[in-house]
Amino acid sequence: MQRKIHGQMSESFLIAGILSISGGLQDAYTYMYRGKVFANAQTGNIVLLAQNLVDRNWQAVLRYFSPLLSFALGVAMAECIRMKYQKAQKIHWRQLVLAIEILLLFAVGFLPNEIDLLANAMVSFACAMQVQAFRKVNGYAFASTMCIGNLRSGMEA
């Protein structure tokens, strides 16, 4: 018996679960091993950035500003990919986003801790591309790297 797939595979609960786990692991990795910076939780980075601005800790300001900027650039890159490849026949634009994300995250694994700034920027860039590319589950709004909105939406449904 064959199963019929309805809608986009990218909107399935399975993909949403995998991406959510991935997003959580990326945040845990950058926070625990790359200088206490959040890859996904940009609100946390904004709070820490503001605290370090007040304390005039300029090195830490850069540490928290870099992922914010990279996140914004990652959203823009995902949109550029969507616009350019949305009608492509051989590969879906979201597959291209995932391929870039995988390559970036693989490369980060080889970066030494002396360049955590670059590593965090790359992870935040990849996270932003994921957030921008995978925005729905079965037609409902979804953020694959943030839990609070998903928990609220899930309880509401």
Predicted regions and their residues:
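Short, Lys/Arg-rich, polar N-terminal cytosolic tail immediately upstream
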Residues: 1-12
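Interfacial helix-start motif at the membrane-water boundary
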Residues: 51-68
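Helix-to-loop junctions at the C-terminal end of transmembrane segments
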Residues: 75-90
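Alpha-helical transmembrane segments of multi-pass membrane proteins
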Residues: 20-38
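C-terminal ends and interior cores of transmembrane alpha-helices
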Residues: 99-116
